[in-house]
Amino acid sequence: MLGSVLTRRSSSGSDNRVFVYEVEGLRQNEQTDNNRYQIRNSSTIEIQVPYSRMNEEDRRITRLGGRIVNIRPAGENPTEDASEN
């Protein structure tokens, strides 16, 4: 019984959270050709990432030569951050 409690996935709010990664420096190559979006070397792109996949996505972006410049919750307006500074 204790084992089943320990292996059961948590149904906390973190399972439903989504974040937006702002990424720069990704290069278009054979691996990125499989993405649903085009990569432009001169600009940043935004990628929606579920909380449960953040670590994997961080590694993938680094492996592809990108750099994460900002992470924010998906529902947050990006202009709100700029007005606070």
From Swiss-Prot:
Recorded GO cellular component terms are: phycobilisome; plasma membrane-derived thylakoid membrane
Localization, per the record, is:
Cellular thylakoid membrane
Q: What does this protein do?
A: Rod linker protein, associated with phycocyanin. Linker polypeptides determine the state of aggregation and the location of the disk-shaped phycobiliprotein units within the phycobilisome and modulate their spectroscopic properties in order to mediate a directed and optimal energy transfer.
Q: Name the chain's protein.
A: Phycobilisome 9.7 kDa linker polypeptide, phycocyanin-associated, rod
| Homology family | Belongs to the phycobilisome linker protein family.
Query: What InterPro entries does this protein's entry cite?
Result: CpcD-like_dom (IPR008213)
Q: Topologically, how does it sit relative to the membrane?
A: Peripheral membrane protein
GO BP annotations of the record are: photosynthesis
Q: Which residues form the CpcD-like domain?
A: 16-74
Q: Which residues cross the membrane?
A: none
The record's keywords, sorted A to Z, are:
Antenna complex, Membrane, Photosynthesis, Phycobilisome, Thylakoid
In terms of superkingdom, the source organism counts as Bacteria
